[in-house]
Curated annotation (Swiss-Prot):
Family indicated by similarity: Belongs to the TrpA family.
Source organism (scientific name): Pseudomonas fluorescens (strain Pf0-1)
Native organism taxonomy: Bacteria, Pseudomonadati, Pseudomonadota, Gammaproteobacteria, Pseudomonadales
The reaction(s) this protein catalyses: (1S,2R)-1-C-(indol-3-yl)glycerol 3-phosphate + L-serine = D-glyceraldehyde 3-phosphate + L-tryptophan + H2O
NCBIfam families listed in its UniProt record: trpA
Protein name according to UniProt: Tryptophan synthase alpha chain
Amino acid sequence: MSRLQTRFAELKEQNRAALVTFVTAGDPDYDTSLAILKGLPKAGADVIELGMPFTDPMADGPAIQLANIRALGAKQNLTKTLQMVREFREGNSDTPLVLMGYFNPIHKFGVERFIAEAKEAGVDGLIVVDMPPEHNSELCDPAQAAGIDFIRLTTPTTDDARLPKVLNGSSGFVYYVSVAGVTGAGAATLEHVEEAVARLRRHTDLPISIGFGIRTPEQAASIARLADGVVVGSALIDHIANATTPDQAIDGVLSLCSALSEGVRKARVS
């Protein structure tokens, strides 16, 4: 079993959802970002999504766009992001880590080289938002052949006719974007999320993680009662944006992560 499969299976046994945290690699700088990354598991993150900075993050809202700008301004690139994963793995061999981003930097790096280095560094999965299933042979298939899960995004506009195609070749978990649009947008209604999870379960046995718009422990707990995973990104990144020192950024992110984790862990306790 992959690290992702193992983690979701363990949490299912414990009857709780996973807290999936997203941060952008190199935001606000390499050392601060690495310290945050290393601190997330102890603060309660069950799965980590690490953003690969890109100049045109079209699916992301303002908070993550600015995180990309800060990271690129600090000279973060794909080579450094993979090095960050290696350094994270020196002290952590069990927390699943997923790289999230866009195809352009991977294409420039070289797909074959990227997959080989990602696997060697300890990457467990990929979310590449601009690679539809029609292009599985370009990245999804070779990644999975190397043992790296390929995680798909589904949205409220992904209808029943399209879903099987989107889920074709998916592994690890399914990431449901609960609000159509860009990341960090308003939270979806719980009724809508419940219906969406039920619909997805008719099409897949993979764990379902819900993201976009979750900012508080209370919201995280509400989603944790319905889904297998709760994804939080923009709310964490806001702490980096608003910090005036590296320590303030680290403490802000990890404090919120701990509070979110507590919300998720208590969600299904009756």
